[in-house]
Amino acid sequence: MQTPVSPPQESLADIRREIDRIDDGILELIAKRLDVVERVRAYKAGTGSLGTSPIRPGREAQILRRLIDQAGDRVPADLCFRIWRALIATASLKQAAIRIHGSAGFFASPASQALLREYFGPTALAEHPSEAAALKTVAAHPGDLAAVALDGPWATAWLEGHAGEAQVIGVLPFIGAASPRPELLIFGHAEPEQTGTDETLVLTDGQLPRDFALQPLWQAKTGSLQLSSLPGFLSEGAAPLVGLTRSNGSLALSVLGRYPSPIEVRS
Ligand SMILES: C=C(O[C@@H]1C=C(C(=O)O)C=C[C@H]1O)C(=O)O
């Protein structure tokens, strides 16, 4: 027996007109957002802070965390992430031309390209023969970024100083189910900003002592060196890192960067 169906109260055309009105509203709001970004660009140009990079990873992370939290069950976290990353990437490109430098070997990975595309949208990718060449280029162009695979051959180039003042400003993926460690590191000159949920990436020659105050969030080997992501926005000159450096000089600890922790969502 068929279940009786009640005739729809409204026509499909009426419902679709409502979708069209909502889309018009979204479009107007996007245009308004881009106009406000132009004022941010002018402000940064006026204070000289565009000279380094228009990208503010801390602010970007706070926007995403707030909206994903506010969306709750009404809008999937992944949709929020994709929409606002597309908006933020375009907003950044409106402020300055940005390129992402990487080695040919790194860009040959479709998975790496996909992670970069979903985070940086249409930002241009510039291919180099090696990680060292990509890091050297970002050192010379502070508004640009460099991307490397966590398990790629970048650490020696970094230790040899090829990245200049560039630091790790973020890791990808930025959203997802808890994973043991990220896949990509992003280098740049954006000023690190504390967001309340941050990590500090350190490179050491050997394991951190077992009794060290902080439990690493993840660790990875890179060549003979040890990479550890520590919870918090830490400074080399303050506790607990300063004590670690003093009592364990042979670790040759260097801070690679400080950045907002990725967003963990249940799969
Ligand atoms: C608009 C800004 O510039 C960039 C774009 C952002 C955005 O689209 O919201 C946020 C931070 C910056 O990476 C800003 O600094 O506020």
Which stretches of residues belong to each language-model region?
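Domain-level signature for soluble enzymes in the chorismate/prephenate branch of the shikimate pathway
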Residues: M1-S267
